[in-house]
């Protein structure tokens, strides 16, 4: 993995999380490809490598892009100009496309609750887990009254235990220590 990929990853991840949140992955993909094409054009490439101020550079770039980019993309361009990151934009695009590819697959999560969850609670849990795992979530939903209250989330070998039973066990272990 190159240093440029390491620098690009947080940008790509932030963009991808925004795209998931706004349900606009395809729109962002097209926008990033469009921005990349502008950056890669010979005339613009020379212009971007000059010693212009970040505000002038971002204003110029936004002018060139015109109505093809929205407010969020304009903010991204301002951020890239401010941090002098236009040179790694191709890496940002590649990282975004990797995240999109992994997102297309479903992550299977076992969700165990003490009682039946309401639909909006399941949707909220799914949204949070999609942000954490950066993939679509498919639930295997079970009810287990023995956990008393709360939920347990299992993904392969990883377990997030937010059950009352688990808290009571931890408390018991501390008191018996």
Swiss-Prot record:
It is a peripheral membrane protein. The keyword tRNA-binding does not apply. GO terms for molecular function: proton-transporting ATP synthase activity, rotational mechanism. InterPro entries: ATP_synth_OSCP/delta_N_sf, ATPase_OSCP/dsu. Transmembrane segments: none annotated. Keywords: ATP synthesis, Cell membrane, CF(1), Hydrogen ion transport, Ion transport, Membrane, Transport. One of its GO terms (cellular component) is plasma membrane. NCBIfam families: ATP_synt_delta, PRK05758.2-2. F-type ATPases have 2 components, F(1) - the catalytic core - and F(0) - the membrane proton channel. F(1) has five subunits: alpha(3), beta(3), gamma(1), delta(1), epsilon(1). F(0) has three main subunits: a(1), b(2) and c(10-14). The alpha and beta chains form an alternating ring which encloses part of the gamma chain. F(1) is attached to F(0) by a central stalk formed by the gamma and epsilon chains, while a peripheral stalk is formed by the delta and b chains. This is ATP synthase subunit delta. It comes from Buchnera aphidicola subsp. Schizaphis graminum (strain Sg). The lineage of its organism: Bacteria, Pseudomonadati, Pseudomonadota, Gammaproteobacteria, Enterobacterales. The gene is atpH.
């Amino acid at each position: 993995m190159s240093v440029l990929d390491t620098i690009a990853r947080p940008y790509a991840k932030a963009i991808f999380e925004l795209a998931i949140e706004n349900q606009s992955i395809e729109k962002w993909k097209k926008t990033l490809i469009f921005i990349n094409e502008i950056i890669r054009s010979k005339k613009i490439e020379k212009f971007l490598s000059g010693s212009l101020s970040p505000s002038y550079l971002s204003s110029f770039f936004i002018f060139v892009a015109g109505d093809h980019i929205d407010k969020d993309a304009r903010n991204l361009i301002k951020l890239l100009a401010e941090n002098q990151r236009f040179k790694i934009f191709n890496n940002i695009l590649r990282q975004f496309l990797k995240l999109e590819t992994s997102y297309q697959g479903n992550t299977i999560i076992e969700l165990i609750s003490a009682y039946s969850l309401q639909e909006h609670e399941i949707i909220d849990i799914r949204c949070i887990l999609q942000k954490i795992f950066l993939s679509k979530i498919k639930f295997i939903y079970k009810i287990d009254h023995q956990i008393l209250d709360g939920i347990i989330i299992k993904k392969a070998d990883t377990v997030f235990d937010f059950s009352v039973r688990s808290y009571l066990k931890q408390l018991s272990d501390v008191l018996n220590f």
